[in-house]
């Protein structure tokens, strides 16, 4: 069986609120750590979310 090319990752808020989004990424073409600017409802602002592993 072949290894999957898409993996699930967790995007964790850099505002230390504990807010996270779960998304997928292609691990072969995008090998860097993903960062996205998304909305954090706890602080009511757009903040940067960084990639962490799903436990």
From Swiss-Prot:
One of its GO terms (cellular component) is cytosolic large ribosomal subunit. It comes from the Bacteria. One of its GO terms (biological process) is translation. Pfam families: Ribosomal_L33. Keywords: Ribonucleoprotein, Ribosomal protein. One of its GO terms (molecular function) is structural constituent of ribosome. SUPFAM superfamilies: Zn-binding ribosomal proteins. Belongs to the bacterial ribosomal protein bL33 family. This is Large ribosomal subunit protein bL33. It comes from Agrobacterium fabrum (strain C58 / ATCC 33970) (Agrobacterium tumefaciens (strain C58)).
């Amino acid at each position: 069986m072949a290894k999957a090319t898409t993996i699930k990752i967790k995007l964790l808020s850099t505002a230390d609120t504990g807010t996270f989004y779960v998304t997928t990424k292609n691990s072969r073409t995008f090998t860097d750590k993903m960062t996205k600017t998304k909305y954090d409802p706890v602080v009511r602002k757009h903040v940067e979310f960084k990639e962490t592993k799903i436990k």
